[in-house]
Design a protein with these regions (language model features):
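Helix-breaking motifs and short loop linkers at transmembrane-helix boundaries and internal kinks
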Residues: 24, 77-83, 250, 272-273
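Symmetry-related core transmembrane helices of the 12-TM Major Facilitator Superfamily/SLC fold
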Residues: 147-163, 342-359
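Helix-loop-helix hairpin linking two adjacent transmembrane segments in secondary transporters
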Residues: 81-83, 112-166
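A late C-terminal transmembrane helix in Major Facilitator Superfamily
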Residues: 303-339, 347
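Helix-to-loop junctions at the C-terminal end of transmembrane segments
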Residues: 44-57, 238-251, 334-335
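Cytoplasmic helix-loop-helix junction between adjacent transmembrane helices
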Residues: 87-125
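Extracytoplasmic gate region of multi-pass secondary transporters
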Residues: 13, 189-229, 235-237
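C-terminal transmembrane helical hairpin of 12-TM major facilitator-type secondary transporters
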Residues: 249-296
């Protein structure tokens, strides 16, 4: 997760202002490149169910990890926008494969062992990857040098990950009968899926442009990329803290609260005129978006216990649709208005709507 998601997927955020300056891009262009990555993520999510049910799931996971590291390194060699689009698209496919394969398999194994409480632990790896990514970025150099450094780090993490899990026996997720699927259906899952799509748009505006937002503030002597470090620092413990809340107040109640807290953070990021305010927004953003990812997938698994692979991949597809639209729309809104206020308000409205969709159905997840 640190390699494929923390670096492969989110390295673009701290490097975005330098890339905009070096390549003379508009925010719309930068948003389109982010969307290319998320289109790849969508394609990967659509293909992922077949992977989780394949006897070659270990090979697919290894290939995805290698592809993630390779496409990160290729950022150093990209010399045209079309090549950038291809690189970021392939990176998105690889990260989706990794997320769905690891999450689905982990949920299946933990449910079998009755250890579901550990089902969200691996999401902390995303925050760890963000922090490792920032260490590489602080090393300096031009954009190509930084992408090459990140590619090497991603490859190192990939090797460590495979050393730790490579000997583990990955079993294909069994396909359940149509009768089993139909008998477990209720609207709780579909409300979760729709809300998760809103979340994809809602979080990605700040997650893509927060460093660019910081760059617009009057912060002499401050490395504006530090805001992304704060996101990573808040991310790592957030999964555990929100799981603790969920254990006491219920999964759906906690998911609803997390959506609302993130909405506050997204609005604050867009309207804040001070560095301190933006740092607080980053704490709220980093402290929720990983946890919402984990809580949302857990809620979907609980709502559809007979079709975990379908639930996880459907949530990922909805999330992908939201996040691929978000950067393209918000980048154009920022170019038109000169700031990120309206884009952030739109994102917050969708997060509030996502919270409103979190309601128990006949298979309540409370």
């Amino acid at each position: 997760m640190a390699s494929a998601m923390g670096i492969g997927r989110f390295a673009y955020t701290p490097l975005l202002p330098e890339m905009v300056a070096q390549y003379n891009w508009s925010f719309a262009t930068a948003g389109d490149l982010a969307s290319a990555n998320f289109i790849g993520y969508l394609v990967g999510a659509l293909l992922a169910p077949a992977i989780t049910q394949s006897p070659f799931i270990r090979i697919w996971l290894a290939a995805s990890l290698m592809a993630s590291a390779a496409t990160t390194y290729l950022g150093a060699e990209a010399n045209s926008f079309n090549l950038w689009l291809a690189v970021r698209f392939l990176s998105g496919v690889a990260s989706a494969f990794c997320l769905v394969a690891v999450t689905t398999h982990l949920m299946f194994v933990l449910a079998k062992e009755r250890q579901e409480r550990f089902g969200n632990v691996h999401f902390a790896g995303v925050g760890l990857g963000i922090l490792i990514c920032m260490l590489a970025v602080y090393g300096g150099g031009d954009v190509s040098t930084q992408w090459a450094r990140l590619g090497a780090l991603s490859a190192g993490l990939m090797a460590v990950a495979w050393f730790l899990i490579g000997k583990h026996q990955f079993q294909p997720i069994p396909v359940v009968s149509r009768q089993s699927i139909d008998s477990g259906f209720d609207w709780t899952l579909w409300r979760l899926i729709i809300g998760y799509g809103f979340f994809g748009f809602g979080y990605v505006v700040a997650a893509t442009f927060v460093v660019a937002m910081a760059q617009r503030l009057d912060t002499p002597g401050v490395d504006v990329r530090s805001v992304w470090t704060v996101v990573g620092l808040a991310f790592v413990p957030s999964v555990y803290l929100w799981q603790w809340v969920a254990n006491r107040f219920g999964l759906l109640n906690t998911l609803k609260l997390a959506y609302l807290v993130e909405a506050v953070g997204v609005v604050l990021a867009g309207i804040s005129g001070s560095y301190a305010g933006l740092l607080l927004a980053c704490v709220l953003l980093g402290g929720t978006f990983g946890a919402i990812t984990a809580l949302g997938l857990s809620a979907a698994r609980t709502a559809a216990p007979n079709r975990v692979a379908f639930a996880v991949s459907s949530m990922t597809v909805a999330f992908s649709l939201g996040q691929l639209i978000g950067p393209a729309v918000s980048g154009r809104m920022a170019d038109a208005s000169g700031d990120f206020v309206m884009a952030s308000l739109l994102a917050a409205v969708l997060l509030v709507a996502a919270a409103g969709l979190v309601r128990p159905g006949k298979a309540a997840v409370t």
